[in-house]
Amino acid sequence: MEGKEEDVRLGANKFSERQPIGTAAQGSDDKDYKEPPPAPLFEPGELKSWSFYRAGIAEFMATFLFLYITVLTVMGVNNSTSKCATVGIQGIAWSFGGMIFALVYCTAGISGGHINPAVTFGLFLARKLSLTRALFYMVMQCLGAICGAGVVKGFQKGLYETTGGGANVVAPGYTKGDGLGAEIVGTFILVYTVFSATDAKRNARDSHVPILAPLPIGFAVFLVHLATIPITGTGINPARSLGAAIIYNRGHAWDDHWIFWVGPFIGAALAAIYHQVVIRAIPFKSRS
C-alpha cells in the first residue's frame, strides 16, 4: 500500500511546475523572442540587387491593378441612375477591400505588399525598411496608380470624364477639416492593422497564421471605405488619389488634393508611433 501511495504522490506531482496562462504565457514567449534589428537608413547595396527592383516592379503592378479595378467600379456606380441598378457604396468598398486583400496576398512575399505610400511611410518610421527602398516604393506606387487610371481613361474616355474619374474630393457639406480628419483616422486604422497583422513577434507564436495577414488588412480598407466614402470618397492612399487626379486633371480634383497626402501621412505616423511605442514598447526595451 505504501508503494502505491508513493506512486500516486509522484504522479500527482510529476508536473509540479504550474504552466503559465494568459498574459503570463505571453511573457514566457517574450523571453525567447528577439527583436529584429532596425533597417539601416541608407542601404546602397540594395541598388545592386535584382530583388530590390523586382519588389519595386511588384509594387508598380499591384497599384496599377488596384487603380484599374477600383476606378472602373467607382465609374460604374457614378454612371448609374438608380442605386438598385449598381453595387452602390457597399460595392465600391468591397472593390477596394477585396483588391487589397488579393494584391497583398500576391505581393507580400516579394515586396511586402504595401501598395500605398502611407503604409510604406509608416513602416519606414518603424525602421522596417530603408529610406532607399521606401522612396523607390513610393515612386513606383505613384507611377502604377497613374498608369492604372490612364488605362481606364483610354478605354472609356467619355465615361471617365463625365463620372469624375474616381478623383478624391471633399464632398459638399463637409469642411476641409472634416476631410482631413477622416483621412487621418482612416489611414490610422489601416496602418495599425498592417502593423498588427505583420508583427514579427506575433508571427513567432504558434497561434498566429501569417498567411491570413491580407484578410484583416483588406477588411480594414473595406470598413474605412464604408465610413468615409460620403466624406472624401476615401483616399487613405496618396498614390490612388494622385493617379486619379493627374489623369482626370480638372480644377476641383486639385482643390483639396493636399488633404489626401497630409492626412494619410499623419495617420500613418500616428499608427507607427502607437504600435511601436505604446503596444510594443520598443524604445523602453532598448534601454533595459
UniProtKB/Swiss-Prot annotation:
Its main location: membrane. Belongs to the MIP/aquaporin (TC 1.A.8) family. PIP (TC 1.A.8.11) subfamily. PANTHER family: AQUAPORIN OR AQUAGLYCEROPORIN RELATED. InterPro entries: Aquaporin-like, Aquaporin_transptr, MIP, MIP_CS. SUPFAM superfamilies: Aquaporin-like. It is found in: Cell membrane. This is Probable aquaporin PIP1-2.
